[in-house]
Amino acid sequence: EIWWLETIGGHHWMARRVPDDAYVVMPNQLGIDAFDLEDAFGAQENYLCSSDLREFIRDNHLDLSLDGCLNPRDAFGSHDDADHVYNTPRAWFMLRHLNPNTWVWDGPAADYGPRSDDLPWCMVPERKLTPEDVKYVLSSHYQGTPFDPYASYGDKSMKGAYRSIGINRNDFMALIQMR
C-alpha cells in the first residue's frame, strides 16, 4: 500500500492512496487532482487529511469546483506560468513515455500536451515498468519531440522550450523496487 502525501502549508496536509498497479509522476508541483473529503473524514479508505482541512478550505474559500468535487490542484496549486516551462512538460513527457497509447499526446488534436494543467495524477501503465523505464524518464530531455534541446533535426523553433528532466544540475536519484 502506497500513500501520496501533499503538504499544503499552515500545518495542513492531505494524502491519497495510490491505486494498486498505478504509478504517479509529479515534478515539483502539487499533483493530486481529486480529493474525497467524505472518505477522508469517514472510512479513510483512499483519502486522509489534517483534522481541520475542511474548515481551512471553507474559511479561505479554496474550493474552486463547480460540481462539489474538490480538485486540490485548483485549490492549492501554484498556477504559475513557470509551471508550463518547468513542471507540466516534464510530467507530460513521463506519462507520454510510460503510457504511449492510452491518450493522444502529440499534435493539435492531443488529449494532453506539455502545457496541460489537467494531466492525470496517476495512471496504470500499459505494461510492467522496470527500473530502466524509471531511469530513462528521469534522465530524459524530450528526445523524440520538437522540444529536445539536443536534437539536430526537425523544426528548431521549439527546441529547448521546456526544462528537461535530466540536466547537469541533477545530483541525486533514488530508485527503490519493492517486491
Protein language model regions, located:
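C-terminus-biased signal that marks the final domain/tail of proteins
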Residues: 2-5, 9-179
